Amino acid sequence: MSDPAAEAQHVITQTPRPRPGLYTLHTDGGVVAPPGQAGGPAAVGAVLKNSANLLVEAISRRIGHVDDHHIAEFRALIEGLRMAKRHGVDKIRVFTDSELLVKGILEDIKLKSAEHRGLRDQARKLYASFLDQKLSWVPREMNTEADLLAGRALPIRPTRG
């Protein structure tokens, strides 16, 4: 007879089986910044859908104080990619309304702080770990679900960058 505790431990440590199909991930970060300031309380939103456009999981979470909205955008991407990995996704299309985020991941642009560079490196590593991936900029109007989720986690409406 097998030990149920040992079996439970085995299940917990298993790597998720890759899920077939192409998944989409929309991400957004928001910041409530006082007038004249770039930083403040921040939140992330992310929406993962399967190839049938059905919701797999969504995130709406405060992430504490950040120095600017770019940090919130990088954090949203990282949390969204981690969510996809937890679901065993290996083919993904990622959409964001942050041009700097797309350029930061796909191009060698200079970022202003060590925190930005560290988040970029972390996001790049996660992004590259997918078997098939594409990151694209979309207008804010095409990113409304992630935008609403990020905004919902904040005490007041976020600033836009």
In which residue ranges do the predicted regions lie?
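Intrinsically disordered, low-complexity regions
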Residues: 1-24, 57-59, 87, 129, ...
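Active-site phosphate/pyrophosphate-handling residues
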Residues: 75
